[in-house]
């Protein structure tokens, strides 16, 4: 074997980092995905995410999974944002209708501020795993709150689960149409949803 032949480096396998490269971890890859979605819109591809992270697509797949796994992971993050905002809005301790409408306003504020991420995680529709998980997490707190509200008022708590799902569904669909058509003020939209939902929550009929 000649010295020149011995100097030829081993070929790097696809998806493997170059020598000396630092491979982003899963959290850093998710951050890169969020950045590119926020800047380029909800139609970004896995190739776009890889480019934003400065890695090959196989590295993204190895650390996150496929597109569905990415959507599911970012849906969890988005629900965390919603939960934090709604919890802050409820911490004022006013209670009743004022707290309900404040939570609706908080949800729409988060959606408005991060609209591309919202559209990305809800793009698959209600039949997708990511949206089902989003609904389950978003509604769990409402089920507890609606049950407590009805019980404290001496009313049947049975409808609480249905109304929680209905409220989450209303937020999702109304927000999608609002972002698409740009109609109305977000606080007015929150008030409109409250006008529809609140009477059922607080009456026996």
Language model regions located:
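C-terminal peripheral helix-coil segments that are non-catalytic and often amphipathic
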Residues: 1-13, 144-151, 177-205
């Amino acid at each position: 074997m000649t010295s020149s032949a011995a100097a030829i480096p081993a070929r790097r396998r696809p998806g493997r980092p170059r020598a000396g490269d630092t491979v982003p971890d899963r959290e850093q890859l998710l951050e890169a995905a969020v950045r590119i979605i926020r800047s380029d819109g909800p139609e970004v591809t896995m190739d776009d995410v890889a480019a934003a992270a400065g890695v090959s697509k196989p590295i993204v797949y190895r650390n996150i999974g496929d597109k569905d796994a990415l959507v599911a992971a970012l849906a969890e993050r988005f629900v965390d944002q919603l939960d934090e905002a709604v919890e802050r809005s409820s911490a004022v301790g006013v209670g009743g209708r004022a707290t309900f409408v404040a939570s609706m306003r908080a949800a729409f504020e988060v959606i408005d501020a991060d609209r591309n991420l919202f559209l990305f995680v809800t793009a698959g529709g209600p039949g997708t795993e990511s949206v089902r998980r989003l609904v389950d997490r978003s509604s769990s707190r409402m089920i507890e709150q609606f049950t407590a509200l009805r019980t404290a008022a001496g009313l049947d708590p049975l409808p609480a689960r249905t109304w929680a799902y209905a409220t989450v569904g209303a937020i999702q669909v109304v927000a999608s149409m609002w972002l698409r058509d740009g109609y109305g003020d977000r606080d007015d939209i929150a008030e409109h949803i409250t006008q529809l939902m609140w009477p059922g929550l607080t009456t026996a009929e």
